[in-house]
């Protein structure tokens, strides 16, 4: 697994057609696992997963959320440090401010933790760091 600087808080905007949803994602180390907790702007949990030994596991009583799991996996790819990219994702391609895992994810960076993430069958996500300020 890549080395992430944790804990991390991100503002996620999900963009589909003319609809937009806003979420807050908290990524934190918990023993040998990384916990991913996503909530809406009112603080209501939307998805929670733990990543341990390269496997995703449901965390808590929330129903499975395949889209969130795909989003979390794509975010892990997007947040992987450049020096660790090839070891973790051998098929990945990096060109300047763009990083692609063919058939999976397309990331375009504005800044290190600020980027647009596109999935092949949609949706698009705009991701920016949260520095203690609500969006």
What are these language model-derived features?
Residues 1-23:
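N-terminal leader/targeting segments and the immediate start of mature chains
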Residues 1-4, 26-27, 102-109:
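Short linear motifs in intrinsically disordered
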Residues 16-43:
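Structural recognition of beta-strand segments within beta-rich domains
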Residues 11-13, 44, 48, 55-135:
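Mature, soluble, non-transmembrane domains
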Residues 2-5, 29-32, 49:
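Edge/loop elements at the starts and ends of beta-strands within beta-rich repeat scaffolds
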């Amino acid at each position: 697994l890549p080395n992430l600087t944790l804990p991390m808080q991100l503002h996620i905007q999900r963009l589909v057609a003319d609809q937009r949803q806003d979420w807050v994602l908290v990524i934190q180390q918990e023993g040998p696992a990384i916990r991913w907790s996503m909530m809406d702007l009112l603080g209501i949990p939307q998805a929670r997963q733990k990543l341990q030994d390269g496997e995703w596991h449901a965390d808590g009583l929330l129903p499975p959320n395949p889209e969130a799991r795909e989003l979390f996996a794509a975010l892990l790819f997007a947040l992987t440090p450049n020096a660790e990219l090839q070891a973790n994702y051998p098929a990945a391609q990096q060109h300047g401010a763009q990083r692609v895992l063919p058939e999976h994810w397309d990331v375009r960076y504005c800044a290190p933790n600020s980027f647009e993430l596109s999935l092949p069958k949609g949706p698009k996500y705009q991701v920016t760091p949260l520095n203690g300020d609500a969006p």
